[in-house]
Each structure stands twice: as structure tokens, then as C-alpha cells.
């Protein structure tokens, strides 16, 4: 699975050859095809493993029991750290885009993420960090869309720059929905999270 994730993280789906995966793990083609009869079957398995990785990591953030908006901020940095440093996480997101439209997998997955973030945003409204009258689902959809956009326009192989894009996004977005009285603290919190995440990511990587 690790070899497959590396291939899917570094190449477009259409350019990944199962022979490359077989060569990387030194197994026979027969053994590979016994477990994964097609490239799509292997890709689907990678998506499933990436989902498990993400679920475990998110559970760790939720266990910190921070405020709702702090949790949303932490989750964005968590995803960025995984995306820039873990081939499995990166491959899972790439594959959701490339094959996830088949049978609506991408739409369902993103819908589940938006629903989960909306629940956290709703808590942030109750706690006073998000201003009254802001729709939690709208905020959740905005955050997901923003991350996807940064992912498309940024460079995942330049983690420090990518994290700065996340920080700038929060700086621009928060005035639109955060309680003005909390902006100073929240801005400081975002900067601290950038610094913490910067210590977790690998140096810039060149092309494979």
C-alpha cells in the first residue's frame, strides 16, 4: 500500500502503472492482481487507507477539546501537514479528485466533511467565536472550498510556503464570520499554529 500511495501521490492517476508498484515492493504480478485486480481497485484501497489515517488524526485533534473555532483552525493545519508530508494522505486526496466522481464518491466524502465541520462551527457560534447570524454550514463549505483551492494553486512540495497560504487564508476569511472582539486572539492563535505546523513538516522536496 505504501508503494502504491507513493506512485499515486507523485503521478496523475492516468500515468500510474501497476508494474511500477510491483517493482517497488518486489512481488509478482500475480500476487498483486490477486489482491487488486485493477488499478481502480488499488486506488480505491488507497483512498480507504487514507480515510482511516485522516480519521485517526482528526480524533486526536478533537480529543484536545479546544473551542470550536480553535478546532477548525487546528484541523486545517492538520490536513496541511498530512498533505505535505504523508504520501498516503496526499494520494487519497488526489484520487478522490481523479476517480472519486465515479459513483459520487467525491461528493459523498466532501459532504461528510462539510457536515462534520458545520457541527464544530455551530459550537463556535454558541461559544461566541463566530458571530451570530452566520450559517455554520456556509462556513464549513467555505473552509473546505478554500483548502481545495489552496491545494490546487499551491505547492505541496514546499510545505513552509503552503502553511503560509493557510495562515493568509484564515487572516482573510475570519473577519467575514468571526466575532470582532475575538479577532486579536484568533489571529494570534493562527500564527502560533503556523509556527507549530512548520516544525512538523519536512523541508521542501524536489520533483520525484
Walk through the language-model features, giving the residues of each.
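Generic hydrophobic, amphipathic alpha-helix propensity
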Residues: 1-4, 21, 46-54, 117
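Hydrophobic alpha-helical connector segments
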Residues: 45, 56-89, 136, 140
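Secondary-structure edge/capping motif, primarily at the C-terminal ends of alpha-helices
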Residues: 61, 90, 150, 154-157
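Phosphate/oxyanion-binding loops and surfaces in catalytic or ligand/nucleic-acid-binding neighborhoods
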Residues: 78-82, 86, 146, 150-153, ...
Amino acid at each position: 500500500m505504501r508503494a502504491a500511495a507513493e506512485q499515486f501521490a507523485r503521478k496523475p492517476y492516468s500515468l500510474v502503472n501497476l508494474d511500477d508498484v510491483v517493482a517497488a515492493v518486489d512481488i509478482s504480478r500475480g500476487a498483486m492482481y490477486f489482491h487488486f485486480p485493477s488499478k481502480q481497485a488499488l486506488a480505491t484501497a488507497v483512498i480507504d487507507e487514507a480515510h482511516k489515517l485522516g480519521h485517526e488524526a482528526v480524533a486526536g485533534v478533537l480529543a484536545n477539546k479546544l473551542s470550536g473555532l480553535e478546532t477548525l483552525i487546528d484541523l486545517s493545519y492538520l490536513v496541511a501537514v498530512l498533505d505535505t508530508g504523508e504520501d498516503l494522505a496526499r494520494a487519497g486526496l488526489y484520487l478522490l479528485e481523479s476517480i472519486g466522481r465515479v459513483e459520487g464518491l467525491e461528493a459523498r466524502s466532501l459532504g461528510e466533511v462539510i457536515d462534520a465541520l458545520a457541527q464544530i462551527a455551530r459550537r463556535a457560534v454558541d461559544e461566541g467565536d463566530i458571530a451570530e447570524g452566520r450559517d455554520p454550514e456556509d462556513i464549513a463549505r467555505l473552509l473546505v472550498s478554500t483548502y481545495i483551492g489552496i491545494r490546487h494553486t499551491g505547492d505541496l512540495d514546499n510545505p513552509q510556503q503552503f502553511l503560509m497560504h493557510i495562515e493568509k487564508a484564515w487572516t482573510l476569511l475570519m473577519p467575514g464570520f468571526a466575532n470582532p472582539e475575538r479577532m486579536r486572539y484568533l489571529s494570534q492563535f493562527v500564527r502560533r499554529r503556523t509556527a507549530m505546523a512548520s516544525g512538523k513538516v519536512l523541508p521542501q522536496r524536489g520533483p520525484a
